[in-house]
Amino acid sequence: TPIHHYMGCSTFSNYTVLPEIAVAKVREDAPFDKICYIGCGVTTGIGAVINTAKVEIGAKAVVFGLGGIGLNVLQGLRLAGADMIIGVDLNNDKKEMAEHFGMTHFINPKEIEGSVVQEIVNLTKTPFDQIGGADYSFDATGNVKVMRDALECTHRGWGQSIIIGVAPAGAEISTRPFQLVTGRVWKGTAFG
């Protein structure tokens, strides 16, 4: 019987061979409905912050998409000591849970005038930084337009945009070269 993989991972089989580093021992009494998230959402979200972006204390960050992975990016940002943590989602019902995970500001792109990029740039300006822009952004949507917005809302000179979301097969992302020439960085990550 063939085993169909998603990103090289399989769990719907009677036996699976994997490296020791990929195994985590859990207590026998650990509730499966809670620990089942550890294998992807938690490690992917927190790992993107800690391992891929290496977010530092005091950073300004944006998370696009507040589902399971996005919430854990928020949690990772809180653990890393980010000061401003902006969540972006089309669903206002996600705001309360996102605040619980560490979000400090919420933007629903359907409820603002103008672009979400300009909204974030304006929100991150300070008296000492009139350019604005997030130090870090994270895409947890898999939407290529959102991936572009995530890059373009980061700060000129040092902004990093981390792509976590998986786009549809064959999809392409694009931006103006100026966005990268001015010091922004696009990175991808899988499983944190």
Regions found by a protein language model. Name each.
Residues 27, 130-135, 187-191:
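Glycine- and charged-residue-rich phosphate/anionic-cofactor binding loop of Rossmann-like
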Residues 82, 143-192:
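Glycine-rich phosphate-binding loop and adjacent beta-alpha segment
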Residues 41, 65-69, 166:
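Glycine-rich Rossmann-fold phosphate-binding loop(s) that bind the pyrophosphate
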Residues 44, 69, 77:
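Hydrophobic/small residue at the entry helix of a nucleotide-binding pocket
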Residues 63-66, 78-149, 170:
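Adenosine-nucleotide cofactor-binding segment
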Residues 1-64:
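NAD(P)H dinucleotide-binding glycine-rich loop of Rossmann-like/cofactor-binding domains
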